[in-house]
């Protein structure tokens, strides 16, 4: 569709712009970025060694493992490519997207022409889920962020990612400093399923 064509044009336009690589969060991005440096995001749903090896063989230079993977299973996921280990990472901070949709859940409140691209959905328990619109899609986020900044070395990975979506520039700077100093998080947060795993 048009969105995919626009994405392909943007990638082609940036190839000589000095970027270190491209983050891919959808399997379709692998085709769009084929032959370019790629790092896999959590949208690829990497939860096991088979998936990790598939993406490594397809050319990912690094990849993010989903927060649904138990800490004891993370080290078994790391793939190899060309006889060398492919770096793996985890989310150390971020509001996880719960749903991505082309239909707008806010359109009953106001039309797109009068929308500031942000909103909130409230569930029956009065929990507020942030909504952000952009690039033709709407993303509904978990209101409680994952935070692992105070647990350095708890997970066997090569790097950590701070995923900023709802935060202001100042809030992001504060969170990065908390991660750098391994400070505890102030407010509600989750550890994902790193220490629980899925059944």
Predicted segments with their positions:
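Active-site pocket-lining/capping segments in soluble small-molecule metabolic enzymes
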Residues: 1-54, 58-199
